[in-house]
UniProtKB/Swiss-Prot annotation:
Protein name in UniProt: Small ribosomal subunit protein uS2c
Keyword set includes Ribosomal protein: yes
Taxonomic lineage from the root: Eukaryota, Viridiplantae, Streptophyta, Embryophyta, Tracheophyta
Subcellular location: Plastid
GO terms for MF: structural constituent of ribosome
Record keywords, A-Z: Plastid, Ribonucleoprotein, Ribosomal protein
InterPro entries attached to this UniProt entry: Ribosomal_uS2 (IPR001865), Ribosomal_uS2_bac/mit/plastid (IPR005706), Ribosomal_uS2_CS (IPR018130), Ribosomal_uS2_flav_dom_sf (IPR023591)
UniProt family annotation: Belongs to the universal ribosomal protein uS2 family.
CDD domains named in the record: RPS2
Length: 237
């Protein structure tokens, strides 16, 4: 796989607070190779390594997108959920930014059934058929639709398992990460100083709490996916 240039700037990462880690008491010793300094009780990640692994991740998603592969972005933290949704829309990816539905990937047949139901209900609503139901039945169906939309709305067009999953917070999204590991889906993950760098296929040392840091990392990945997709579209015209 040929390496490409993704305009990853250390000063930009410093400004976004990418290097800020957790307090030294909360660290994972496995993160030692990715930490550059300890200052006032806080660990700071080595941004040179962040740039290296972010570049590798961009290369991976670029080449995957250029071959028509599908991506899933997972970030269910309230403060970062909007960033994940924006990234998914921009890159035309699938997204889970509410509570992770247990077994979503490992029990894919059940998820498929629920997605079919969601799409059917959306079509029924658009056609105005829900309004023809009795009030009680209409209310029950609308509650079901709202629930499905909340938890599966970001993947409603997903017709198969994703090829690559991008996980923004290892601790918050451990269930999703574990499902990916179980069925062998490659993962890209942001890892703060309290994370395990060995779990994801590509781990990007970065602050996974600050919105500015999350957006910067996602922006780079989204740009790489979009670049890859444009090449795929041109090849298939």
């Amino acid at each position: 796989m040929t390496r490409r240039y993704w305009n990853i700037d250390l000063e930009e990462m410093i400004g976004a607070g990418v290097s800020f880690g957790h307090g030294t008491r909360k660290w994972n010793p496995k993160m030692a190779p990715y930490i550059s300094v300890k200052h006032k009780g806080i660990h700071f990640t080595n941004l040179t390594k962040t740039a290296r692994f972010l570049s590798e991740a961009c290369d991976l998603v670029f080449y995957a997108a250029s071959r028509g592969k599908q991506f899933l972005i997972v970030d269910t933290k309230n403060k970062a959920a909007d960033s994940a949704a924006w990234a998914a829309i921009k890159a035309r990816c699938h997204c889970v930014n509410k509570k992770w539905p247990g077994g979503m990937l490992t029990n894919w047949s059940t998820t498929e059934t629920r997605l079919h139901k969601l799409r059917d209900l959306i079509m029924e609503q658009k056609a105005g058929r829900l309004n023809r139901l009795k009030k009680k039945d209409e209310a029950a169906v609308k509650r079901q639709l709202a629930r499905l939309q909340t938890y599966l709305g970001g993947i409603k067009y997903m017709t198969r398992l994703p090829d690559i999953v991008i996980i923004v917070d290892q601790h918050e999204e451990y269930k999703a990460l574990h499902e990916c590991i179980t069925i062998g889906i490659p993962t890209i993950g942001l890892i703060d100083t309290n994370c395990d760098p060995d779990l994801a296929d590509i781990s990007i040392p970065a602050n996974d709490d600050a919105i500015s840091s999350i957006r910067l990392i996602l922006n780079k990945l989204v740009f790489a996916i979009c670049e890859g997709r444009s090449g795929y579209i041109i090849k298939n015209i």
